[in-house]
Amino acid sequence: MYNVKIENTGRYVPDNIVTNEDISKIVDTNDKWIRERTGIKERRISKGENTSHMAIKSAKDVLRKSSIKADELDLIIVATCTPDCFVPSTACIVQDAIGATKATCFDINAACTGFMYALSVASQFIKSGQSKNALVIGAETLSKMINWQDRGTCVLFADGAGAAILTRSEEVGLISQYTCSDGTGGKFLKCDALPVENPYVSEKTEFLNKLSMEGREVFKFAVNAMIDSVHKVLEKTDYTIEDIDYIVPHQANIRIIEYVAKKLKVSQDKFYINLHRYGNTSGASIPIALDEMNEKNMLKKGDKIILVGFGGGLTFGAHLIQWN
């Protein structure tokens, strides 16, 4: 078995900044209401760029900083629940755009936990020897699945992409991982795809292709799932929460993060938070945050970092990584 590390990171967000004041012109809300309930001040919303466009730009960003070239990649995984199309996969579109001709490519849909799942899968490919260099991307255009008349969701979600290159390493980079799902709660966060319509269907089914969310149920699930994931990922090691330098949570809601910090008995200063600027970008939120930290030179060799997320499905999970 080989060791795996994150070799570098990248990100891309649309230029279009939508403030809470802008949202208040669309639905009955205001800046104070949004900030107090979510912690969000502004978010990035696409003016036409689709998921693959943002995924490609985040891929080019990480490749620009990496010592690994596109033709050295042998695996590309894109985590998204908002692909451009059913076929081809977003990963294949990225492959074509960056010239990664030797890569196996596929998408993963675990909603906001997608990047956690993709990291887990990519690391297993590398550990087993099947791959050496993997590009993992979380990319979402949530603005196209939002009901812009529903203030409970349209104030939260946004667009963006984050990327990381994983590579075989002599040093341990990905220390432990934990992923889990609870399909019984799938109805709490949902967006339909296409209805079954063909000459043999006699009755039309109810169909809603916009995101719906039961906020209270998602909150209860989220805080418990994140706390459980942190405990589970630490249980597999000799480390305790005191050994952790940073926690990078899914950037969903400041109240969730505050509650988790309190229950873990950890200072909120240990949590990297940027949701006030980007909103909830689903599977892109953790890699965007990680790249910001990397760009700011916050991460030092040997730092222990927990990445932890939750999302529709319901899905949840965490990774304990050591920065190399």
UniProtKB/Swiss-Prot annotation:
Keywords: Acyltransferase, Cytoplasm, Fatty acid biosynthesis, Fatty acid metabolism, Lipid biosynthesis, Lipid metabolism, Multifunctional enzyme, Transferase. Coiled coil: none annotated. It catalyses: malonyl-[ACP] + acetyl-CoA + H(+) = 3-oxobutanoyl-[ACP] + CO2 + CoA. It is found in: Cytoplasm. InterPro entries: ACP_syn_III_C, ACP_syn_III_N, FabH, Thiolase-like. Its EC number is 2.3.1.180. One of its GO terms (cellular component) is cytoplasm. GO terms for biological process: fatty acid biosynthetic process; secondary metabolite biosynthetic process. One of its GO terms (molecular function) is beta-ketoacyl-acyl-carrier-protein synthase III activity. Residues 251-255 are annotated as: ACP-binding. It comes from the Bacteria. It is an enzyme of class 2 (transferase). Pathway: Lipid metabolism; fatty acid biosynthesis. CDD domains: KAS_III. The active site is at C112, H250, N280. Catalyzes the condensation reaction of fatty acid synthesis by the addition to an acyl acceptor of two carbons from malonyl-ACP. Catalyzes the first condensation reaction which initiates fatty acid synthesis and may therefore play a role in governing the total rate of fatty acid production. Possesses both acetoacetyl-ACP synthase and acetyl transacylase activities. Its substrate specificity determines the biosynthesis of branched-chain and/or straight-chain of fatty acids. Homodimer. HAMAP family: FabH. Belongs to the thiolase-like superfamily. FabH family. The last Arg residue of the ACP-binding site is essential for the weak association between ACP/AcpP and FabH. This is Beta-ketoacyl-[acyl-carrier-protein] synthase III. It comes from Clostridium novyi (strain NT).
